[in-house]
Curated annotation (Swiss-Prot):
Cell inner membrane found in the keyword field: yes
One Gene Ontology cellular component: plasma membrane
Gene this chain is encoded by: atpD
This enzyme's EC code(s): 7.1.2.2
Keyword NAD: no
First-tier enzyme category under EC: translocase
Protein name: ATP synthase subunit beta
Organism: Actinobacillus pleuropneumoniae serotype 3 (strain JL03)
Keywords (A to Z) from UniProt: ATP synthesis, ATP-binding, Cell inner membrane, Cell membrane, CF(1), Hydrogen ion transport, Ion transport, Membrane, Nucleotide-binding, Translocase, Transport
Length: 457
């Protein structure tokens, strides 16, 4: 292959000069003689290409030889990647020796054509009450976990992986995009302790890595998930955190000298998001169900990054700081969270009516809060007092102990089937449990546990 030499280094951006007749294509991977991999981002003319470094550019100097590999970055795919931790280039970083893969795929691939895509309305039960009731997941759908800092996005995601791996025994791919190394480490040990590590491929590009790594690591993970899908499996693809993918794009964009757009984001924000999201789709052979954590800067859902992500999702799970401050975990906001699946034709009349009933009761309670704050409970009508009492029970019953949080809570995690969830909330709405004190509903699993607790009070 053609060889060139480094002519300029500005941080993570490196210009390489090649002979005029052998200029690499955009997205080709180049290898520096020091072992560093570069990815071509722009052709500047005159044999010059501008690249982004996928690793630290410390110690590089002008004149170093660079070889063109002739294709994009290629990463290992297939069952050999399960139980392993890899970096953006697919190299193992868990000190367990080589991956031993049978195939390598390019990380830049076309999305499946419209004819190949399939649309399923089958529900994926998560065992988390508030999600199964209010914003049910579709098998092969896209889910976003929206929340500010510290409201529980990663814990929710870990619980979902644990529940789905154990209850549905499917394969998962986890892409850690610009997250804390500590979380990556915790996550690995959590998967080991739950005995589900052999069903998960882990790909990490953490916070301390250069922007090129963080920008491409989501594509590395997605490529591995696509391989499982094309083998006819139903695979789960977890991204933590999609906001850092956008942020890495912003850094790269600035380094490449592009003019920023709104709030300083890259002008290509919507396109970059589309390139990733369009590939996360289900085909007639298999499905990819994706769960993406979305950090919301300053809790502002209208920020361009979360706003662009919203457009691609089937279900949005919004985590609220107000609910977390009440000590109700998972801190999902039942009035803000939505799902395209919550339709009587998909989930059935009973589920739909119970979910809307729960939202209606909580909405009414929200409206009455101002009156209660000014005049007190005694000024409410009997009907409104009943609404408030039931809403407070619903609020508490939406909380649930998690398996992955047993270390912190000291209580046993609970998996609640959809049938039990609907039965419990239907009972509360119909006044079946009006005699039970509200504290019995807090951090309980199914309604049977609540009744049992109340009998001991």
């Amino acid at each position: 292959m053609a060889t060139g030499k480094i002519v300029q280094i500005i941080g993570a951006v490196i210009d390489v000069e090649f002979p005029q007749d052998a200029v690499p294509k955009v997205y080709d991977a180049l290898k520096v003689e020091s072992g560093l991999t570069l990815e071509v981002q722009q052709q500047l003319g005159g044999g010059l290409v501008r690249c982004i470094a996928l690793g630290t550019s410390d110690g590089l100097k002008r004149g170093l030889k660079v070889e063109n590999t002739g294709n994009p970055i290629q990463v290992p795919v297939g069952t050999k990647t399960l139980g392993r931790i890899m970096n953006v280039l697919g190299e193992p970083i868990d000190e367990k020796g080589p991956i031993g893969e049978e195939a390598r795929w390019d990380i830049h691939r076309a999305a499946p054509s419209y004819e190949e895509q399939s649309n399923s309305t089958e529900l994926l039960e998560t065992g988390i009450k508030v999600i199964d009731l209010i914003c049910p997941f579709a098998k092969g759908g896209k889910v976003g976990l929206f929340g500010g800092a510290g409201v529980g996005k990663t814990v929710n995601m870990m619980e979902l992986i644990r529940n789905i791996a154990i209850e549905h025994s499917g394969y998962s791919v986890f892409a850690g995009v610009g997250e804390r190394t500590r979380e990556g480490n915790d996550f690995y040990h959590e998967m080991t302790d739950s005995n589900v590590l052999d069903k998960v491929s882990l790909v990490y590009g953490q916070m301390n890595e250069p922007p090129g790594n963080r920008l491409r690591v989501a594509l590395t993970g997605l490529t591995m998930a696509e391989k499982f899908r094309d083998e006819g499996r139903d695979v789960l693809f977890f991204v933590d955190n999609i906001y850092r993918y956008t942020l890495a794009g912003t850094e790269v964009s600035a380094l490449l000298g592009r003019m920023p757009s709104a709030v300083g984001y890259q002008p290509t924000l919507a396109e970059e998001m589309g390139v990733l999201q369009e590939r996360i789709t289900s085909t007639k052979t298999g499905s990819i169900t994706s769960v993406q954590a979305v950090y919301v800067p300053a809790d502002d859902l209208t920020d361009p990054s979360p706003a662009t992500t919203f457009a691609h999702l089937d279900s949005t799970v919004v985590l609220s700081r107000n609910i977390a401050s009440l000590g109700i975990y998972p801190a999902v906001d039942p009035l803000d969270s939505t799902s395209r699946q919550l339709d009587p034709l998909v989930v059935g009349e009973e589920h739909y009516n119970v979910a809307r009933g729960v939202q209606g009761t909580l909405q009414r309670y929200k409206e009455l809060k101002d009156i209660i704050a000014i005049l007190g409970m005694d000024e409410l009508s009997e009907d409104d007092k009943l609404v408030v009492a039931r809403a407070r029970k619903i609020e508490r019953f939406l909380s649930q102990p998690f398996f992955v949080a047993e270390v912190f809570t000291g209580s046993q995690g609970k998996y609640v089937s959809l049938k039990d969830t609907i039965r419990g909330f239907k009972g509360i709405l119909e006044g079946e449990f009006d005699h039970i004190p509200e504290q019995a509903f807090y951090m309980a699993g199914s309604i049977d546990e609540v009744v049992e607790r109340a009998s001991k009070m």
